[in-house]
């Protein structure tokens, strides 16, 4: 029998439980022995495949590389319940009568609506059933103990009986229970035939002494042995041996032997599948055996490590470093690495000669001949014959000189003589070079060359921009090197970081890297629309210095100016640009400079008078910008017609310029802009020089007394606040705020005491490195050290200065820290390191949760956002369908372009008197391309109109404010239409993964960077934000801190009115107002009788009451919450049979309580009185008062409480009252309010770090079912099998999938990767539609264009249609799955 494999995509995979018949059909042999030497088929039968080189499989006649392996089998002497489904089998048996094999209750009595939970509902219903409704037989109680089904007496049940029961269950009952009778019949849950894995899944390891079996083989051997011991032949021999023995009593009976081996068989089969509890161990070493579950599940298992792993050939890894001479899209690759990595190239008639020359010049490593495509020829062994092998110490005589061999790779030359051990070798073979001739159809694997594109990756791969393509530049170095401007998305800092490169192996992959993933085409981030590219460190310092030069002041020599100008690549024509600079300067500064006469000398050189005006930093910077680029922002920067007029270039300003240049001119111009900045500033700093020394750390001596006095004043103020504040929590908060304010004031003093030329100030002001906080720590003081937002705990014994004992450091790094200060600083720094180590795993796991849950969400050709299951999440991505990396914010709205900038640039060529505003008809005509193009199945017409309004309104608002001329109207419309289609998110884009990565990367990087600000309040803020981020994603039902903001409608929202409403909100019980209580004799004092006469109080007579309870109340609590004595009195008297009287004296708030209470029960009675309700809402532990700056009114912030309770209050402001508990919002206001709350909370946590479109998609994904879902494994239960398996609980999901007979059509991302298919996302979502008539037409009519010189050139026909003219047939061939 021969096996001819066919390579084809798998259409679908159906899961189920194999029946004995299917196992036998699948098996290729019956295993009868465990010994290799025995006759018959053993555990390593060649019918199951081979694992030895040179041997072929007896089933498929394939070698070790091509044989897929085949299963074997053996028959079990006793049926064994499959340990995977033992609980399901037990539950099914509880529902079946053992007498009549019917369902124990009538089906008509059950009303089951939920098919997903059908089996669970049935189990709950039959739990209390005692008899079968059909035959009235008693139900047998069953349970599972140690992977064995037992009865109520804990005795194992006969599996033959269990199998007989399940075999007699009819298919209708099986379907009713929720199982598939064909794919997962319950009878298949019991093994009668056991499958044996092929040897390739459990290969042995050969050593010099013996052969070591795999753990699975070891288990199979034990299973087969115990199964053979249960056979009749073995039991008969055991019984015969027992009878022949003289001491029969010393040998166990046959039944005991059978039970022993049966128990061992159950144990071995159970641990064969799952040995996670490490029960099964090797007899010799006691090492736990690895089961199937341990092989498959876990991070290092077969699923995540192999099937979903990213390890591949043609990749390299080494340390990465910076190279300022590289362009933005270039990557320096070590020559040694480039000679190893290869790219396959097919030989054609057009490139045969060139590839032949390449091969014969040692630029290719392997050759695959068309005649034998399975064999790869190593060209290094074929082309270069090295000749005689040289040894270390050999001596080569060449032209009268002697060369001692220290490198055995030394190349001999004809005429060389080899002297070895003092004697000359007689036979010497000199190197030969063989010429290779290529044929059409061959494939060569050439070495990496300059200009090739490779994929660069740094781990952890947190987001899309962690993998980008670069153009290779090969250099004789040992490390990878990249441009510093592209380090931001990789987050690499060159402190030993390593990066990976992946070489594309197909033309399609090369095209995608070049056109889609290239660094120069990924300028803007899809995460938040901000630049991925950023000028950093030295270049920023150079820009800062150059931009501070003033016009009309020559700061550069003529030679220096022109030398620096030569570093700018692709610069404009010098004379034209110089004339333009002079023209702009003359119009802006007519009173400055000498503008008379020509600006050029007789020989065409720049005249000295012009040189004195423009030979400076701003003159150089003017050559960087496009000739028509304008910018005038609130940062003081002014650029007109590309001429840098005024302002200072620092980090944020440069990032803004990069974004505007990208939107106005595209990625090519902005890439050249970034490259030229670095080339210019690098050469400028080489001439100028820049360094930081000890003198930069020294502050002005006059500032030291100010810092000391400021510190003392801060301590005095904090002491005053501590003494007057009663609440310890508020006291600590106020103290910490005062101490932190001291640091803020010292930061200002530090900046003032250093000159503007101080190199520390230069680095901070330019944005190159550090901040004013770092300067303050170096020169002034370190300030208060905090851990988790709290002050450091002090020592046990009292100190002279309480604040310094609690972590306030009054010294700077220059002055040095005292031992106590050093300890506190180390404590805070240690916390930062711990957070980085521990919280990184938490945030990383959160990112993986988001990616796995959203990996199948993508944009379809109708621009709806759906997943492979067809579930609709958004009608259009982000409510407008825009790509965040292509949008820009204008007038507070996200739109396609800045019309103001565009019009200003276009209007420059026209007289301002000819400008006019646009009419409404013109505006409507200019935006008519934004309209519903088709009526799609998923988008209702009213929603489509709303989408159009969202897209149109920001553009229309800008068009109404501009002025232009008639000639520019069609040009303006054409540009708007182009921007619109460029800004749309492309169909096929995996917006689910992009959004999850964007939010995950933000939280992970925030955690990683906490140690940079160790000891400051920023560290605690990041930790709290991460905790809140988890609560929102996981929809925690009991958040850590439930807070509510309560607003009232009546009144003007003053603090006095809010305080009066405090007692209606805070839950106050009698215990809260009691300071202490005592039991005293019931002496009849004079005010008792007066009180009885005035109020007719039911005070017991003195003869019946001998004791009274006197409560001393907390005056501050009673007055703070406006609690009247009458309220306390009514609360106690309404609940207990007591009388309450308040003392009329000013000695304090004293409440006497009388009642008919036995003296020995007084203490227990007081314990019952203390929890008595006084006022407020239940669950509200504390309240505080705050002012809303937006509404300019005060509100109450509570700890605890629910919206439903607040809505019962009078005058409650329902619109603004809110809570941070998403479940409370959902139960009170519904799912839409919960969605908006989720968006609002995520925006507050993340800020502008992630685009709002990604946040909305996350909220829609977790609320689209109408209920709140969490970002956990429980939400994954509704996904396809392979999606669930690729996340968590791998084996458990496999078990459930097989039990429920699920089918996966392999359209998901995880399923496609596991099965070796292309995931239908991105470019793989579509196929290329070819015009075969044009391709196959005869040469006379072939689509070749004849040029003027008579030559021909092939062209690709392009349809000259606009998007409005596309017909519906354009989407016919798209695969929407």
UniProtKB/Swiss-Prot annotation:
SUPFAM superfamilies: beta and beta-prime subunits of DNA dependent RNA-polymerase. Coiled coil: none annotated. The lineage of its organism: Viruses, Varidnaviria, Bamfordvirae, Nucleocytoviricota, Megaviricetes. It is an enzyme of class 2 (transferase). This is Probable DNA-directed RNA polymerase II subunit RPB1 homolog. Residues 1351-1363 have a biased composition (Low complexity). Zn(2+) 1 binds at residues 57, 60, 67, 70. Component of the DNA-dependent RNA polymerase that catalyzes the transcription of DNA into RNA using the four ribonucleoside triphosphates as substrates. Largest and catalytic component of RNA polymerase II which synthesizes mRNA precursors and many functional non-coding RNAs. Forms the polymerase active center together with the second largest subunit.
